[in-house]
Amino acid sequence: MQYYPNDVAITTQSVLDGMSITHVYYHSTDGIWEFFPDQEWVVNDLRLVAMKEIVSKDPRLLDVILKMSEREAAFYDYDEHRWVIIPYSYTD
């Protein structure tokens, strides 16, 4: 799957345990968020970041992130912060 500059991938808790990622959302070119339950991911291709960090990189993502959290509990509330998963390519 190709990632574009504003893509965000969000996964289940399994990534924190170093296991394979089983649930991924991503932003497609037409602006629709899609869910791929059968897509395989490698943990090394993704990066755990604080939500405030990703919002600081692209403030337009704030509304999208908040809507996604209402749809499904795809975020981590960990260590008193909210976290999401993004591709390494987004932060390079």
Where are these regions (language model features)?
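Acidic, aromatic-enriched beta-alpha/helix-loop junctions
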Residues: 11-14, 27-69
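Broad, structure-driven detector of short, well-ordered beta-strand segments within folded domains
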Residues: 22-27, 74-76
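Negatively charged, low-complexity tracts enriched in Asp/Glu with abundant Ser/Thr
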Residues: 1-12
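Short, compact, well-ordered microdomains
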Residues: 58-92
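Glycine-centered positions within short beta-strands or beta-hairpins
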Residues: 18-19
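A sequence-level detector of short linear motifs
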Residues: 22-23, 35, 84-85
